[in-house]
Amino acid sequence: MKRIKNFSFVFLITSFLFLILDFIIGERFLKKIGLIYIEELIRVSNDQYEYSFEKNLNVDYAVWGDQYYKLCTDNRGFKFNCFDEEKKTYEIAIIGDSFTEGIGLPFEKTFVGMLKSKKNLDLVNLGVASYSPHIYLKKIKYLISKKIIKFNHIIVAVDLSDLEDDW
């Protein structure tokens, strides 16, 4: 009976340690080789305007639902196409929620990316999923006051769900 208890104890401890090591090492390994990029690493909190994208991302496997997509951000955390040079001044800034961000899509397939390439417009995408009018205002004020970015025009892409996000 004592052998069974000892075996059970050793088995439980070994299983527990294996699961912990598998979780820690496995997740780190997958992140390192770019096969997993969880939302907590992509979307980060921001003291000035709630949250934003992590800066300087270039990942092939950002996840939205069951889809993987390429995501690149610049040194300010703005979604962009990975190839453009970062600029300080733009003709038009577009801010909004998931539709503006183009969640689940690489930059080139978002409406901002298509306007930029097809119409040759000088645009920057400030959109992030679940943003609301309150966050739009905070982000725009912060970016302007700290001289992080300049733009001549802003398009605020508001949708009906944005109002709920502020409650």
What are these regions (language model features)?
Residues 91-95, 124, 154-156:
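Conserved beta-strand elements of the Class I
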Residues 13, 87-88, 119, 150:
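Residue-level preference for short coil/turn positions at secondary-structure junctions
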Residues 26-55, 133-167:
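Interaction-surface signature
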Residues 29-118:
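Membrane/wall-proximal cationic-aromatic binding patches
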Residues 116, 121-138, 144-145:
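A conserved hydrophobic secondary-structure block that centers on an alpha-helix together
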Residues 21, 96, 158:
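Active-site flanking residues adjacent to catalytic metal/cofactor-binding acidic residues
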Residues 1-5:
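Positively charged n-region of N-terminal signal peptides that target proteins for export
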Residues 6-24:
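Hydrophobic membrane-insertion alpha-helices, especially the h-region
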